[in-house]
Amino acid sequence: MTVYHLNASYEGYAKHFHQYYKQPYKTTHTFANFGYIGLIGSIGAYNDVSIGLGQKVWITTEQDITSRLGNPWTYVLRDVIQFADSIDSALTMLVNAHRTCSVHLGLGEYHRNTSGREDDDDNVGFLGIEYSAKEFNVFAWEDMYNTTQHPVLENVVYWDPYVQPSNNTCLGSLLVEHYGRIDAPTVIRNITSVLKTGNTLNMVLDYNENAVYIAYSAPEDPQGPIEAFNRVHTRIDMAKLFAEPVPTIDDE
């Protein structure tokens, strides 16, 4: 399971900017791009071979590791999700990209055509990536930073939304509290809402279910909460979504 929590100025996004639109792809993977109409590239996406990709900001004082010259990271993520066949081919594309800004990435893959149980953790591969023009660091759960605020947890790769230690609630402490029973409802009710992260877009990708739970901010809703992490999430069955026929234009 993967959580992508976009934090931005949620007051500026109107309800008309997130709509369903399907475009036919005959020579590449079908994929779902979770973002906004008019946003070029990807910030969170998932394709029909169960590869998922998302990002969060990577704040670093080492300014020399970034560049404004190259392929914007949103374009790179879009290419990866459309053309990568596996987590290995996705890594190759990311390594060879003309990288620019520094971002944290989460890259996952579900091995759906295996003989193991559907809920077997061995069916899921997931990596955390520090991505920038001059640095590219890959972390499995065993390689994650191991500190008091950021403990290593088996089969869990995570980036804290806040610099630790700080007065902000740490993601690590919440993961420890709920470890062993972390599912999409638990993440939505007890983790992202407590951290108050994902105010513009909050997306939980469940690889076992082949489903996405997603919520957007709603600045035009006079009654409900504005922030995405506080709103009701919509569950999308990705197998059914990818099977939806492409709309046709009536020549008449």
Task: Indicate residue ranges for each PLM-predicted region.
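C-terminus-biased signal that marks the final domain/tail of proteins
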Residues: D79-E252
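Cysteine-dependent hydrolase recognition
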Residues: T30, A45, I51, N71, ...
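A contiguous strand-loop segment
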Residues: M1-P72, T100-H104, T200
